[in-house]
Amino acid sequence: VKPGTDVVLALALHRYLFANNLADTKFLSANSRGADRLQTRAEQWTIDQAAKVAGVTSSQLEKFAELYADRNPAVIRCGWGVERNRNGGNAAMAILALPAVAGKFGVRGGGYSMSNSAALKFSPSMWLQAKEPSTRLINMNHLGRVLLDYNDPGIEMLFVYNCNPVATMPDQNRVIRGLRREDLFTVVFDQVATDTAAFADIILPATTFLESYDLVNSYGEMSLQMSRPVIDSVGDARPNVEVFSELASRLGLDETETDAEALLRVTSTMPDDIRDNLLEHGSVSSSINARPVQFVDVKPRTPDGKINLFSEQLDAEAPRGLYGYQDLSENNFPLTLISPASNSTICSILGELVERAAPLEMHPDDAKARGIQKDDAVRVFNGLGEVQ
């Protein structure tokens, strides 16, 4: 499947289900809103049209549609990679709407799965007593325009932690121009010298998981784990809790708190059995039913408990509207570079140990068309930048 075309395939499946009377209209009527709007948006994507755009055969796509409609239970496991392109949000929406339209909810093993990280109902509201202050919220994906264009008021100070925006934020060139502002005071608090650290006025060393306490859940596990330090902090490195506690104290907001004290305070708000198991054994499994059936044991957390298949707000915000598709191939730049997670690093961690000459994988047909052979040095570029 060509990168960025997942939304087209999903919409073709929706059209197939509606057109062949395979949509579960009874379920949709009782448990969803906006199904008619979704159907309208999917109408343009026939099996043949979607297959041509996605680079698969019509017979392959139709066979998949038949299998999905026929099998019960049927589950969709949606990961995060599908959203990492300009059509990503619409793709995730279209894919996760399929179980509702096809009527795959209500049975064990049916529906969809993305993450079990909320299985323990573990929320910061359990230990944060003060109300959230009334402050301005800024979309982190708009960092470049925020740093350059916001003036009511403008951003004068940036504190970067747990992220590397120069490498991860959209519109990289604009982000870099913003970070180069002479009047912007930037602090980078990290474990390694990231791309963003090159633009910092001050760099503060952070501890790794080997040096600090933490509470950890995951996308797949039905458990909560406690991470304990196994070595002392190296050099001047400090954990997040202590740095922000010190900042709060200097601002007259709160008393200082160590990493261990914060852990004990947080666990004290938990039910006794969870707290005791966590502190004694280092992990605790979910005390709730870990195998819920969607639309039997659990329902959406929307105000009416229904699936919203067409959000008017998202439709207004999306550049091409909800379920819209943008052709990612341009005349001058017909290929798409995918940058998935690496088996050599964890985000920026260990990045300093990776050899600079990274391998590029290409489809043999694309490589042949460009005269590229194995072990050749290549230049990957578009109108915004390049990597060699």
Each language-model region and where it sits:
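Non-catalytic terminal/interface segments that mediate subunit docking, oligomerization
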Residues: L98, G103-G106, G305-E352, P364-A367
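Cofactor-pocket helix-loop regions in the catalytic cores of large enzyme subunits
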Residues: V1-Y112, N116, W127-D297, G305, ...
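Cofactor-binding active-site loop characterized by glycine-rich and histidine/acidic residues
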Residues: P124
